[in-house]
């Protein structure tokens, strides 16, 4: 038999790479001071590229700091995972991608500006950034459609529609009717059937190309539009 011994030096480098933090509200990366639903689905993901240090569902909650500041308050309220944990807070691990996923479904019952602050760390202690992720968002309880306009205006080939939706429910009917100055309907657009409408600011992917219901170009001039919406009839 062989009785050989081989030795070789090797170096282990410390993990210095920051994990990636991603935060969405109802599937959207919101901008600062955007309007959101009073009961949003907030998803927080921490993605670590190190395949040798797998995040742990039970232990690594300590590596997160999630805080909310309510309207007219100067205090940050920490969201707890265990002692005093909220029923609307869940978390799990995607082991294949080494991703820690937190799902938070709060009910914000005050109108006003809220602040969310999040910081996460991987197993080595690398933070997701030098500063915590922080964003302001606004909650408006009343259901309304405001700030409606088409863009660009005037237009030559196509125009999109922009509007702000508030409240907690998406209308099950949201139509835009375009009429001439005599009030005759020339085009009806069923936005809820062709658009992914969300609470907050919306700009349609759909564009009106200046054609009527029969596909014929309309004459140059001024046209009027109105919005008809229904929530649960």
Q: Which residues does each PLM region occupy?
A:
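Short, compositionally biased serine/threonine- and acidic-rich segments at solvent-exposed termini, linkers
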Residues: 1-152, 156-158, 166-168, 222
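Glycine-centered loop/turn motifs
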Residues: 31-33, 173, 196-202
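Surface-exposed loop/turn motifs at beta-strand-loop junctions within extracellular Ig-like
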Residues: 48, 120-124, 180, 212, ...
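Generic short beta-strand
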Residues: 66, 118, 175-177, 208, ...
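Short, surface-exposed loop/turn motifs with a glycine/proline- and acidic-biased composition
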Residues: 109, 113, 190-232
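Residue-level signal for well-ordered, solvent-exposed loop/turn and beta-edge residues enriched
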Residues: 126-127, 184, 216
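Glycine-centered coil/turn sites that cap beta-strands in beta-rich domains
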Residues: 136-151, 155-182, 188-193, 204, ...
